């Protein structure tokens, strides 16, 4: 009798994806982030579902319903902070996952990479809409500022903004539709993740050397299942420490004040994981230019396969490119810092310099460095 694991139509799919999957024997801890993102997504959907049971998407009661969850619902505070800080963990892992992809040349799997970029956009949209739901000051003004950016689109802009708002300002209609989208998008993300994995399993995983590893594969279980479980335990330890010791570390105190359309907070800023993009947006004095720079700062990821000039796939044996990548990381950290600062000298200038460097490193320096390395290696 054949093993049910290999014969049952449904279990067979799981088997080929997580158990008998041939995996390179040399993938490092940088390959753990995919599974960690999966766990984060599951955690967000579960905590979100429980929050939705008690939340009301109405401007008059949204803020107090979140307060009610924290004060009166059994372990409501835990669910709420797990959801809020889980989003931060999600983005940390997303950025590590993308960084790994850039360092080891994983973007050469074109379909997998492009679906990954679409996933990033979907997760960013979901996080933005989720931030609006508690209906605090930063929720309201964040929604107003970010949706208003679309008014920079020529001709259809202003109409588009009012269409998204469902009125002439961010109000009840906006909150209701944001809740609807925030609820449905994670399930769309889950479907996209499955497609992401489908395309990944067509080619097999990349590995640190960037070389073909068909000659040296091991089964996913038990080797990488154990490795992934270790990653998950470390993640849960970090997340629980954050939730139980300083749950508001990454939040904004302004969001503990109910939304007031008549009172603008002194510094409007998004959650920390959007600050780098926000800094790029603010560094350009022109509204449309800023919006285009903002969009392109993420869309630029789609150009990586085209900009890959090296004869080697991975950066493992390319020290100059490695240096450039770490400069890019430092640059992104500077942008994140600038995004949280007020718009005044010297922050404006630093932000502009960092924004220019961001695009220059990716579009000019990295490809030219790759060509130089090819020359040095007489390739």
UniProtKB/Swiss-Prot annotation:
The record's keywords, sorted A to Z, are: Electron transport, Heme, Iron, Membrane, Metal-binding, Mitochondrion, Mitochondrion inner membrane, Respiratory chain, Transmembrane, Transmembrane helix, Transport, Ubiquinone
Q: Which Gene3D superfamilies match?
A: Cytochrome Bc1 Complex, Chain C
Quote one Gene Ontology molecular function term: ubiquinol-cytochrome-c reductase activity
Can you tell me which residues bind heme b b562? Answer: 83, 182
Q: Which cofactor does it need?
A: heme b
Sites binding a ubiquinone sit at 201
Localization of this protein: Mitochondrion inner membrane
Q: Name one Pfam family in it.
A: Cytochrome_B
The record gives the membrane topology as: Multi-pass membrane protein
Q: Which CDD domains match?
A: cytochrome_b_C, Cytochrome_b_N
Provide the protein name: Cytochrome b
- Which biological processes are named by the entry's GO terms? mitochondrial electron transport, ubiquinol to cytochrome c
Family designation: Belongs to the cytochrome b family.
Enumerate the transmembrane spans: 33-53, 77-98, 113-133, 178-198, 226-246, 288-308, 320-340, 347-367
The UniProt function text for this chain reads: Component of the ubiquinol-cytochrome c reductase complex (complex III or cytochrome b-c1 complex) that is part of the mitochondrial respiratory chain. The b-c1 complex mediates electron transfer from ubiquinol to cytochrome c. Contributes to the generation of a proton gradient across the mitochondrial membrane that is then used for ATP synthesis.
Lineage top rank: taxon: Eukaryota
Instruction: Describe its assembly.
Output: The cytochrome bc1 complex contains 11 subunits: 3 respiratory subunits (MT-CYB, CYC1 and UQCRFS1), 2 core proteins (UQCRC1 and UQCRC2) and 6 low-molecular weight proteins (UQCRH/QCR6, UQCRB/QCR7, UQCRQ/QCR8, UQCR10/QCR9, UQCR11/QCR10 and a cleavage product of UQCRFS1). This cytochrome bc1 complex then forms a dimer.
The principal location of this protein is: mitochondrion
One Gene Ontology cellular component term attached to this UniProt record is: respiratory chain complex III
In the UniProt entry for this protein, what further remark is given in the free-text comments? Answer: Heme 1 (or BL or b562) is low-potential and absorbs at about 562 nm, and heme 2 (or BH or b566) is high-potential and absorbs at about 566 nm.
The record lists heme b b566 as bound by 97, 196
The cofactor note from the UniProt entry for this protein is: Binds 2 heme b groups non-covalently.
